[in-house]
């Protein structure tokens, strides 16, 4: 948290007094007893049901019966998370996105076990924290954001494999067309703007040629087999030894830093 504040200070979004005041509000404990009286509990453990279930049992032993427990999982359904709980109606998913301390979006997902009151209570708290909340009507693998992302990843990798364009040119198209457009208007707002009739004509031409595979592309399988798994390995779709990593990290956080307007403690 202190390191994250250094980024805010560097960009003129906070001063040292804000950092110090925020740190004073933070309590770190190794005991579940510290959760007694909590309004909401977030669980951000490894994606292992055994680990999560053990945590829920410990949390339920100290919090009120109606205190929501929100998992930050990106993949495990709520109905699997709540199995064996004393009060499964409290269980839900509140899935944030990296970098969590500055990315405003949270996906809020319930299951067949989840009480509407738990969802509403969590929603109200997230809104009070200036989050942008996507409320799913039902749970599906990948929720909303990762389904959209995987659709784009799949088509992008397919175009590389088919020799349509390379990674750099596809990223150029995303950054200066798709990304810029949908940063200020919604995808489906634009669909309505274009109109159903024109979108139908485009779809009839493009849909039959889109990637429809339901397995991981060979380019990914080959990269894993060779140890070329991306940025951390130094080689993936890009040769990262030829890229400015510090510049990449700055660009990765810049859009979110520009949107910060929090009232910070003093």
Residue ranges and their predicted role:
Residues 1-5:
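Conserved phosphoryl-transfer catalytic core
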Residues 9-69, 76:
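Rossmann-like NAD(P)-binding element
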Residues 68-146:
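Rossmann-fold dinucleotide-binding core
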Residues 117, 131, 162, 167-266:
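NAD(P)-dependent Rossmann-like dehydrogenase/reductase catalytic/cofactor-binding core
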Residues 128, 149-155:
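Structural/interface elements that position substrates and couple domains in central-metabolism enzymes
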Residues 135-139, 158, 172, 176:
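Short, flexible helix-loop junctions that flank or precede catalytic/ligand sites
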Residues 150, 160-162:
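AAA+ ATPase "lid" subdomain C-terminal helix
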């Amino acid at each position: 948290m202190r390191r994250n504040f250094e980024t805010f200070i560097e960009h003129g979004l906070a001063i040292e007094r804000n950092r110090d005041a925020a740190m004073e509000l933070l309590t770190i404990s190794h005991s579940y007893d510290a959760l007694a009286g909590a309004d909401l509990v977030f669980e951000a453990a490894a994606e292992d049901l055994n680990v999560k279930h053990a945590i829920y049992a410990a949390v339920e032993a100290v919090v009120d019966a109606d205190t929501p427990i929100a998992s930050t999982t990106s993949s495990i359904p709520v109905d699997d998370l709540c199995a064996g709980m004393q009060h499964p109606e409290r269980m839900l998913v509140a899935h944030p996105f990296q970098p969590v301390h500055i990315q405003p979006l949270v996906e809020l997902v319930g299951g067949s076990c989840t009480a509407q009151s738990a969802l509403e209570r969590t929603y109200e708290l997230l809104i009070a924290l200036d989050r942008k909340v996507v409320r799913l009507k039902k749970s599906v693998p990948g929720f909303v954001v990762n389904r959209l992302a995987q659709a784009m990843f799949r088509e992008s990798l397919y175009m590389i494999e088919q020799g349509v364009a390379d990674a750099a040119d596809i990223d150029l198209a995303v950054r200066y067309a798709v990304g810029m457009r949908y940063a200020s208007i919604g995808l489906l707002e634009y669909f309505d703007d274009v109109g159903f009739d024109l979108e139908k004509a485009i779809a009839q031409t493009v849909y039959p040629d889109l990637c429809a595979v339901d397995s991981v592309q060979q380019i990914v399988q080959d990269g894993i087999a060779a140890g070329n798994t991306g940025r951390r390995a130094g080689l993936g779709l890009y040769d990262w030894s030829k890229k400015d990593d510090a510049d990449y990290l700055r660009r990765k956080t810049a859009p979110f830093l520009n949107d910060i307007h929090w009232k910070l403690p003093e």
